[in-house]
């Protein structure tokens, strides 16, 4: 996560190869952060609906994406 500022800067590169690589890396980082915070919210007793509202998605979408992960813990 320490490299997020460098990745954001690289995403603004005029070199498409550099920019696209940075965008892909930022996407992976974002997925990791989202999963971490969904786990955190569930551990704090949040409902799927509460999480979904803050992520701007449906309850079904967030449940489908993370329910298996949550039950594995």
Regions found by a protein language model. Name each.
Residues 53:
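Alpha-helical residues within the helix-turn-helix
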Residues 28-45:
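Short, amphipathic alpha-helical "recognition" segments used to contact nucleic acids or chromatin
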Residues 49, 60:
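Key DNA-contact positions within bacterial/archaeal DNA-binding proteins
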Residues 1-24:
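N-terminal acidic leader/helix
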Residues 70-71:
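C-terminal flanking helix
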